[in-house]
C-alpha cells in the first residue's frame, strides 16, 4: 500500500486496517471473529433488498466490503456487485471465496473517494455497512457515496450510536463479556449519533427514507430489526 497520501486517499486509518488484516483469514469462519457479521447478514440483505425494490439486475457497490460477506450475498440475488476496501488481505480472502463459490464480484482496493472520482453516478445501490466508524472522516465517505449513486438510486449506511448504552453493549458486552468480536474492534469515540449522520446526509443530494435499529437479545442469542436506534442502526437514503 502506498504510504503517500493523495487528496483522495487521505481518509484511511492504517491502524484500523491492520486490525482486520490480522484476522482476515478467518473471515468466512462461521464460528470465528466474524460470526456476528454472518448472523446479521440475512437481516441486512433483506432490509436492503426490500427497501431498494429488489437487487436483481442492479449495479451495486459495497463500500468497506471486507471479506465479502454482504457483497457475495447481494451477487447471489442477481446484482452486479463491486466490493471496495483498503485492506489487502481481506480482499484476497474475498476474491478466493468468490472463486470457490462460483460467485462473480469485482473487488477493488481503493478508497470510496478515489472510486467516486472515476465512477460518479454509476450505481443503482451503494451500501456502507459498519465502515463509517473506522475512518478518520466519515462525512467524506457519505459525500462520496452520494456522488456514486444514480439519480433515484439507494444508499444504505449502518453504524453504531455514540452513548453509554452502545459502549456497554458493543464494547464491554460484545468484546469483553460475550467475546463476540475481538477486543479493540470498536472505539466508542468514533461511534456516530443518528443526528450527526443525518446532518451529513442533508448536505448531499441524498434524502432520508427510513431508519431502523438492529437489536441483539443475549438471552435468545438472536438479532432483529426494529424501532430504537440507541445502539446499532441502519439508514436508507435515496438520491434526489
Curated annotation (Swiss-Prot):
Molecular function as annotated in GO: 2-polyprenyl-6-hydroxyphenol methylase activity; 3-demethylubiquinol 3-O-methyltransferase activity; polyprenyldihydroxybenzoate methyltransferase activity
EC assignment: 2.1.1.222, 2.1.1.64
A Pfam short name: Methyltransf_23
Domain of life, per lineage: Bacteria
Residues that hold S-adenosyl-L-methionine according to the record: 44, 64, 85, 129
Function: O-methyltransferase that catalyzes the 2 O-methylation steps in the ubiquinone biosynthetic pathway.
Protein name listed in UniProt: Ubiquinone biosynthesis O-methyltransferase
Gene this chain is encoded by: ubiG
